[in-house]
């Protein structure tokens, strides 16, 4: 089989190509009255957030990683006039709650923009003051204090969640919160129309029209034979089972097991990758709370049963033993955020201390502010590449959240 543009069969194989989104004007459209609806706790300073993100990207390039940007790929994907018009229609259709019947005026506004300007504007959001309206309808006389016709998408720099590379294919995800649901439309168009992907026959294991929610922060590729997926507030058990069935029936895949891991429904445990991330063949960074719960967690191993031509599901509550078994190692080492200290651990977990990006076995990218965790990693033989994230972290995501691997070398 010809090598395609997507290949991710582990969390730790040498990273060759990664998808990022540089923070843009969408962060400047965050206002205190509407923070919670857009899933933010604070407002990052855009200039500094961009500087921090640029240094993150350069750190990856310095390690030989090709960095591609969501906003650039999306603009290139809509170069065809008909595709561009369909993309605009789709965006407006998914923004009906705020568009308020002004599709024609918004389309006139968009017509003046280049492809890149259009993508940037849709991501940033369209303020009402940007659109000229004639007051011919009653709704236009109403004093609607909501400031946007198209909401900004400030979470887009967390490219991990709207899509996920799984083997040689992707999941294009139905996001849990309405504020993020439009985000996966960009990758839908990129796979379908971008020259790099459109003729590559990239399998889509789940698409965004699925009735069940799933987010990439809950999807971990343990090995070429096993996935771990969090059952969380944002990822449903139904989505995990459907994904497993779709993967198992594809003869080109090597995946044989999907480990569904139930995690608490809370912002602290937003996704599985805020609980633990894999950083070496037998090592994981973990939320220190795992040590209290690791033998009481609900784990469900989904496998294909050839005799029954159906899936079978087995239950366990031993996290460490289950991981060791599927990874084929003698034992698993958990490295706790903040060394498990009640103060340091809580502080560094809040600042995404366990959300590390592995760029090859034993080499990770972390926020420099999590100095207790970083020193512990070094003591365990891990090479730590630190980046500054004082503004980036305000979105409550770390280096893994901010990156979507498109290609890793197999291990």
Swiss-Prot record:
Kindly list the cysteine pairs connected by disulfide bridges.
none
* Compartments it resides in: Cytoplasm
- State whether keyword Membrane applies: no
Q: Which reaction does it catalyse?
A: L-arginine + H2O = L-citrulline + NH4(+)
Biological process according to GO: arginine catabolic process to ornithine; arginine deiminase pathway
Q: Name one Pfam family in it.
A: ADI
Give the InterPro entries listed for this entry: Arg_deiminase
- Print the keywords alphabetically: Arginine metabolism, Cytoplasm, Hydrolase
Q: Which residues form the active site?
A: 401
Task: Kindly list the GO molecular function terms attached to this UniProt entry.
Answer: arginine deiminase activity
SUPFAM superfamilies with a match to the protein in the record: Pentein
Pathway in which this enzyme or protein is active: Amino-acid degradation; L-arginine degradation via ADI pathway; carbamoyl phosphate from L-arginine: step 1/2
Its top-level enzyme class, in one word, is hydrolase
The catalytic activity of this protein is classed by the Enzyme Commission as: 3.5.3.6
- Claim: Cytoplasm is one of the keywords in the record: yes
Q: Which GO terms describe its cellular component?
A: cytoplasm
Membership in a protein family: Belongs to the arginine deiminase family.
Q: What is this protein called?
A: Arginine deiminase
Which organism is the protein's source?
Staphylococcus haemolyticus (strain JCSC1435)
